[in-house]
Design a protein with these regions (language model features):
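N-terminal leader/signal peptides at the extreme start of proteins
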Residues: 1-18
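Low-complexity, S/T/G/P-rich flexible repeat/linker segments used as non-globular hinges
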Residues: 2, 142, 156-176
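Internal alpha-helical transmembrane segments of multi-pass membrane proteins, especially GPCRs
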Residues: 16, 22-25, 46
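Alpha-helical hydrophobic helix detector
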Residues: 24-40
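Membrane-proximal N-terminal amphipathic helix
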Residues: 43-76
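Type IV pilin-like appendage domain
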Residues: 74-136, 161-162, 172-176
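Short, solvent-exposed loop/turn segments enriched in Ser/Thr/Gly
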Residues: 146-149
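Short beta-strand segments that buttress and anchor functional surface loops
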Residues: 151-154
Length: 176
């Protein structure tokens, strides 16, 4: 028994819980919200994946520059694209090891060590304005030949440009 200002009541006399109608209304509201939110979450995930790939590329440009200075040799990046889901890039030591040509921005043989190889997710496409889709940093951390360029990464709704400044070799990331 519980005493209230209206008198004594047994515990079983108090109404509790929700009615079936109230539960159905809440479920209907939640379903309507989910129908709106779920497609937006899918697009959000795609855009986050694109941003992650772009940021990784910026990091790999910076890594290549630092490695070139540290190793006192050319470090090159090559970009391969055009196939469905086959877009990729490679960062390698272009030191002429194994009879190759140092500084030509071509991985002449397996003796020129691969530092990083990245396969781009199939929902992200890659394109490049670099001559022959190759770029490199010399032993002083400047672009080989003093050329700059842009790598564009995009999906169906968004695009990012990774820009290498000519002469200085600085890297910037811009949502385009």
């Amino acid at each position: 028994m519980i005493m209230t200002k209206d008198g004594f009541h047994s515990i079983g006399d108090q109404p509790g819980g929700f009615t079936l109608v109230e539960l159905l209304v809440v479920i209907a509201i939640l379903m309507a919200l989910a129908a709106v939110a779920i497609p937006n979450l899918s697009g959000w995930a795609d855009n986050q994946r694109l941003k992650s790939v772009a940021r990784d590329l910026v990091t790999h440009f910076q890594y290549a520059r630092l490695e070139a200075v540290k190793r006192n040799t050319t470090i090159a990046l090559t970009f391969n694209y055009g196939g469905a889901g086959d877009d990729n890039y490679t960062v390698f030591v272009d030191d002429g090891a194994g009879g190759g040509n140092a500084g030509n921005l071509i991985q002449d043989n397996e003796s020129e060590k691969t530092l990083i190889r990245v396969i781009i997710p199939s929902d992200v496409s890659l394109s490049s304005t670099f001559i022959n889709n190759r770029v490199g940093y010399n032993a002083r951390g400047f672009p080989v030949g003093g050329f700059g360029g842009t790598v564009t990464l995009n999906n169906t709704s968004r695009s990012y440009d990774v820009i290498m400044q000519p002469v200085s070799g600085g890297i910037s990331l811009i949502r385009s």
